Regions:
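Helix-loop-strand module that forms the ligand-binding subsite of alpha/beta enzymes
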Residues: 23-100
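Glycine-rich phosphate/pyrophosphate-binding loop and the adjoining helix
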Residues: 109-178
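Charge-dense, low-complexity intrinsically disordered segments
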Residues: 18, 22-25, 82, 122-126, ...
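N-terminal beta1-alpha1-beta2 submodule of the flavodoxin-like/Rossmannoid cofactor-binding fold
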Residues: 1-57, 158, 162-178
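Juxtamembrane/interface motifs at transmembrane-helix termini
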Residues: 90, 96, 105, 149-151
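Residue-level signal for beta-strand positions within conserved beta-sheet cores that form or flank
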Residues: 1, 69, 104
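Residues on a specific face of well-ordered alpha-helices
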Residues: 86, 90-94, 102, 130-133, ...
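Mobile beta-alpha loop/short-helix "lid" or hinge segments that flank ligand
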Residues: 4-14, 99-117
């Protein structure tokens, strides 16, 4: 397993410049390519005012709208209190669903109170550790079960629904006995 970590704060200026110009810097392009070519994503954001951070959303905005189609995603977030935990299901999950990604069922939320729960043997015995393990198992299962994804079809191009390289005219010719 290869794990690539992308710290968005390192690309903040490049993200803004891309939004203004439409052209990514080499370092931002590398980050985008890392995300697009990944077998799966673990997307984690701090929660601000009951939603994901602006930088997180801005990075998502510079991705091609179809870049995450079918990609398994483990969603994570952190905030000061557990009151913000609903942001996973009411802000972050809908974002990835809109992009046709495949978020796993368990999201991981960490509040300040989730830290520092170790058992007698020094192993983390917190509910947070249990959520992380459950979400990781779901992500691993999604990666192993992932099949080839059907591309998103263009609703304004009837030929995109035919597949197999046949044209709409070819299909109509077959109906007419040609």
């Amino acid at each position: 397993v290869t794990l690539d970590v992308i710290e968005l704060r390192d690309h903040a200026h490049d993200v803004v410049n891309n939004l203004l110009t439409g052209f990514p810097s080499p370092s931002l392009e590398s980050a985008i390519n890392t995300v697009v070519s990944a077998d799966a994503l673990i997307a984690v954001t701090p929660i601000f005012s009951t939603s994901y951070s602006g930088l997180f959303k801005s990075f998502i905005d510079v991705l091609d709208p179809n870049a995450l189609t079918g990609k398994p995603v483990l969603i994570g977030a952190n905030a000061g209190t557990s009151r913000h935990s609903l942001a996973i299901d009411y802000a972050i999950r809908p974002l990835f669903t809109y992009l046709h990604a495949a978020p796993v069922s368990t999201g991981v939320f960490a509040a300040s109170g989730d830290w520092g729960h170790s058992g007698e043997d020094g192993v983390d015995a917190s509910p947070l550790a249990e959520r992380i393990e459950r979400a990781a198992r779901e992500l691993a299962t999604a990666i192993l079960a992932r099949e080839a994804v059907t591309p998103v079809l263009d609703p304004f191009d009837p030929e995109s629904y035919l597949g197999g390289g046949r044209s709409f005219g070819h299909l109509l010719g077959g109906l007419a006995g040609e």
